Amino acid sequence: MTTEKETATPADVEVASQEEQIDQTTEAQVEEPSIEAELAGCYAKIHELETYIAEADKREQDIQLRAQAEIQNIRRRTEQDIEKAHKFALEKFAKELLTVVDNLERGLVALDTAVTDEKTQALVDGVEMTHKEFVSTLAKFGIEAIGEIGDVFNPELHQAISMQPAENIEANHLSQVLQKGYTLQGRVIRPAMVMVAA
Protein backbone atom coordinates (compact mmCIF):
# COMPACT_ATOMS: atom_id res chain seq x y z
CA MET A 1 0.00 0.00 0.00
CA THR A 2 1.30 3.24 -0.94
CA THR A 3 0.50 6.53 0.76
CA GLU A 4 -0.31 9.73 -0.97
CA LYS A 5 3.02 11.18 -0.02
CA GLU A 6 4.78 8.44 -1.71
CA THR A 7 2.72 8.83 -4.84
CA ALA A 8 2.93 12.65 -4.94
CA THR A 9 4.49 13.90 -8.06
CA PRO A 10 6.83 16.85 -8.23
CA ALA A 11 4.00 18.87 -9.76
CA ASP A 12 1.81 18.10 -6.79
CA VAL A 13 4.56 19.17 -4.41
CA GLU A 14 4.98 22.40 -6.31
CA VAL A 15 1.24 23.10 -6.21
CA ALA A 16 1.19 22.41 -2.48
CA SER A 17 4.17 24.70 -2.00
CA GLN A 18 2.48 27.45 -3.99
CA GLU A 19 -0.72 27.03 -1.97
CA GLU A 20 1.29 27.43 1.24
CA GLN A 21 2.91 30.59 -0.08
CA ILE A 22 -0.50 31.96 -1.09
CA ASP A 23 -1.86 31.17 2.37
CA GLN A 24 1.11 32.91 4.04
CA THR A 25 0.83 35.93 1.73
CA THR A 26 -2.91 36.15 2.37
CA GLU A 27 -2.33 35.93 6.11
CA ALA A 28 0.37 38.63 5.89
CA GLN A 29 -1.93 40.81 3.80
CA VAL A 30 -4.74 40.27 6.27
CA GLU A 31 -2.39 41.10 9.17
CA GLU A 32 -0.87 44.18 7.47
CA PRO A 33 -4.18 46.05 7.06
CA SER A 34 -5.08 45.04 10.57
CA ILE A 35 -1.79 46.46 11.92
CA GLU A 36 -2.11 49.59 9.75
CA ALA A 37 -5.66 50.14 10.96
CA GLU A 38 -4.56 49.65 14.54
CA LEU A 39 -1.62 52.02 14.04
CA ALA A 40 -3.92 54.65 12.46
CA GLY A 41 -6.27 54.27 15.44
CA CYS A 42 -3.35 54.77 17.82
CA TYR A 43 -2.25 57.92 15.97
CA ALA A 44 -5.82 59.26 16.10
CA LYS A 45 -6.00 58.55 19.83
CA ILE A 46 -2.62 60.24 20.38
CA HIS A 47 -3.82 63.32 18.45
CA GLU A 48 -7.07 63.35 20.47
CA LEU A 49 -5.14 63.15 23.76
CA GLU A 50 -2.70 65.89 22.67
CA THR A 51 -5.67 68.13 21.82
CA TYR A 52 -7.28 67.38 25.19
CA ILE A 53 -4.00 68.18 27.00
CA ALA A 54 -3.64 71.47 25.09
CA GLU A 55 -7.22 72.46 25.99
CA ALA A 56 -6.64 71.47 29.61
CA ASP A 57 -3.47 73.61 29.67
CA LYS A 58 -5.42 76.58 28.28
CA ARG A 59 -8.16 76.11 30.91
CA GLU A 60 -5.54 75.85 33.65
CA GLN A 61 -3.78 79.03 32.46
CA ASP A 62 -7.13 80.85 32.30
CA ILE A 63 -8.04 79.72 35.81
CA GLN A 64 -4.61 80.74 37.07
CA LEU A 65 -4.85 84.20 35.44
CA ARG A 66 -8.33 84.72 36.88
CA ALA A 67 -7.16 83.64 40.33
CA GLN A 68 -4.20 86.05 40.17
CA ALA A 69 -6.49 88.89 39.06
CA GLU A 70 -8.91 88.09 41.89
CA ILE A 71 -6.06 88.07 44.40
CA GLN A 72 -4.88 91.46 43.13
CA ASN A 73 -8.43 92.83 43.37
CA ILE A 74 -8.82 91.52 46.91
CA ARG A 75 -5.45 92.99 47.89
CA ARG A 76 -6.35 96.38 46.37
CA ARG A 77 -9.80 96.43 48.05
CA THR A 78 -8.27 95.44 51.38
CA GLU A 79 -5.67 98.21 51.12
CA GLN A 80 -8.41 100.71 50.27
CA ASP A 81 -10.55 99.50 53.18
CA ILE A 82 -7.61 99.79 55.58
CA GLU A 83 -6.80 103.26 54.26
CA LYS A 84 -10.44 104.35 54.68
CA ALA A 85 -10.58 102.81 58.14
CA HIS A 86 -7.49 104.77 59.19
CA LYS A 87 -8.69 107.91 57.49
CA PHE A 88 -12.23 107.88 58.81
CA ALA A 89 -11.84 106.04 62.11
CA LEU A 90 -12.36 109.33 63.90
CA GLU A 91 -15.63 110.15 62.13
CA LYS A 92 -18.04 109.11 64.88
CA PHE A 93 -15.81 110.58 67.58
CA ALA A 94 -15.39 113.80 65.58
CA LYS A 95 -19.16 114.19 65.16
CA GLU A 96 -19.55 114.06 68.93
CA LEU A 97 -16.81 116.67 69.41
CA LEU A 98 -18.53 119.09 67.04
CA THR A 99 -21.22 119.82 69.63
CA VAL A 100 -18.46 120.86 72.04
CA VAL A 101 -17.10 123.32 69.45
CA ASP A 102 -20.63 124.62 68.81
CA ASN A 103 -21.21 125.18 72.53
CA LEU A 104 -17.87 126.97 72.94
CA GLU A 105 -18.76 129.27 70.04
CA ARG A 106 -22.22 129.97 71.48
CA GLY A 107 -20.62 130.71 74.84
CA LEU A 108 -18.20 133.16 73.21
CA VAL A 109 -21.06 134.99 71.48
CA ALA A 110 -22.97 135.23 74.77
CA LEU A 111 -19.89 136.37 76.70
CA ASP A 112 -19.03 139.07 74.13
CA THR A 113 -22.28 140.85 74.92
CA ALA A 114 -21.95 140.36 78.68
CA VAL A 115 -18.39 141.62 79.25
CA THR A 116 -18.52 144.28 81.96
CA ASP A 117 -15.28 144.04 83.91
CA GLU A 118 -11.76 142.57 83.91
CA LYS A 119 -12.81 139.31 85.58
CA THR A 120 -15.39 138.65 82.90
CA GLN A 121 -12.86 139.58 80.19
CA ALA A 122 -10.39 137.05 81.65
CA LEU A 123 -13.13 134.40 81.39
CA VAL A 124 -13.78 135.37 77.76
CA ASP A 125 -10.06 135.21 76.97
CA GLY A 126 -9.81 131.75 78.57
CA VAL A 127 -12.79 130.42 76.58
CA GLU A 128 -11.35 131.92 73.35
CA MET A 129 -7.99 130.25 73.98
CA THR A 130 -9.72 126.94 74.72
CA HIS A 131 -11.78 127.28 71.52
CA LYS A 132 -8.72 128.08 69.37
CA GLU A 133 -6.72 125.19 70.84
CA PHE A 134 -9.64 122.81 70.35
CA VAL A 135 -10.14 123.85 66.70
CA SER A 136 -6.37 123.60 66.12
CA THR A 137 -6.35 120.06 67.53
CA LEU A 138 -9.25 119.08 65.29
CA ALA A 139 -7.35 120.46 62.27
CA LYS A 140 -4.33 118.31 63.13
CA PHE A 141 -6.54 115.26 62.61
CA GLY A 142 -7.99 116.51 59.32
CA ILE A 143 -11.20 118.01 60.69
CA GLU A 144 -11.88 121.36 59.00
CA ALA A 145 -14.74 123.86 59.35
CA ILE A 146 -16.77 124.75 56.25
CA GLY A 147 -19.33 127.46 55.62
CA GLU A 148 -18.24 131.10 55.80
CA ILE A 149 -20.41 134.09 54.95
CA GLY A 150 -19.82 135.03 51.31
CA ASP A 151 -18.87 131.49 50.17
CA VAL A 152 -20.60 130.17 47.05
CA PHE A 153 -23.48 127.85 47.98
CA ASN A 154 -22.54 124.21 47.38
CA PRO A 155 -25.29 121.65 48.08
CA GLU A 156 -22.65 119.01 48.81
CA LEU A 157 -21.21 121.12 51.64
CA HIS A 158 -24.12 123.30 52.74
CA GLN A 159 -27.66 122.64 53.89
CA ALA A 160 -29.81 125.63 52.89
CA ILE A 161 -32.45 126.55 55.45
CA SER A 162 -33.89 129.34 53.31
CA MET A 163 -33.13 131.96 50.69
CA GLN A 164 -33.47 135.67 51.43
CA PRO A 165 -32.34 138.90 49.83
CA ALA A 166 -29.11 140.22 51.36
CA GLU A 167 -27.23 143.47 50.92
CA ASN A 168 -23.63 143.34 49.69
CA ILE A 169 -23.82 139.56 49.02
CA GLU A 170 -24.23 138.07 45.56
CA ALA A 171 -27.03 135.64 44.75
CA ASN A 172 -26.30 131.98 45.57
CA HIS A 173 -23.72 132.97 48.16
CA LEU A 174 -24.00 132.34 51.89
CA SER A 175 -25.60 135.28 53.67
CA GLN A 176 -25.71 133.74 57.13
CA VAL A 177 -24.19 130.63 58.76
CA LEU A 178 -26.47 129.18 61.42
CA GLN A 179 -24.22 126.23 62.22
CA LYS A 180 -20.77 125.51 60.82
CA GLY A 181 -20.21 122.36 58.87
CA TYR A 182 -17.15 120.13 59.09
CA THR A 183 -15.17 117.78 56.88
CA LEU A 184 -12.91 114.91 57.87
CA GLN A 185 -10.10 114.35 55.35
CA GLY A 186 -12.21 116.14 52.73
CA ARG A 187 -15.37 114.11 53.40
CA VAL A 188 -18.36 115.98 54.82
CA ILE A 189 -19.26 114.74 58.29
CA ARG A 190 -21.75 117.55 58.91
CA PRO A 191 -23.02 120.04 56.33
CA ALA A 192 -23.17 123.71 57.29
CA MET A 193 -26.69 125.00 57.96
CA VAL A 194 -26.91 128.27 56.05
CA MET A 195 -29.10 131.04 54.66
CA VAL A 196 -28.50 131.75 50.97
CA ALA A 197 -28.70 135.17 49.34
CA ALA A 198 -31.43 135.40 46.71
From Swiss-Prot:
Its main location: cytoplasm. It holds the Pfam family GrpE. Residues 1-32 are annotated as: Disordered. One of its GO terms (molecular function) is adenyl-nucleotide exchange factor activity. The keyword Cytoplasm applies. Keywords: Chaperone, Cytoplasm, Stress response. One of its GO terms (biological process) is protein folding. One of its GO terms (cellular component) is cytosol. CDD domains: GrpE. Gene3D superfamilies: 3.90.20.20, Head domain of nucleotide exchange factor GrpE (2.30.22.10). It is found in: Cytoplasm. Homodimer. Participates actively in the response to hyperosmotic and heat shock by preventing the aggregation of stress-denatured proteins, in association with DnaK and GrpE. It is the nucleotide exchange factor for DnaK and may function as a thermosensor. Unfolded proteins bind initially to DnaJ; upon interaction with the DnaJ-bound protein, DnaK hydrolyzes its bound ATP, resulting in the formation of a stable complex. GrpE releases ADP from DnaK; ATP binding to DnaK triggers the release of the substrate protein, thus completing the reaction cycle. Belongs to the GrpE family. This is Protein GrpE. It comes from Haemophilus ducreyi (strain 35000HP / ATCC 700724).
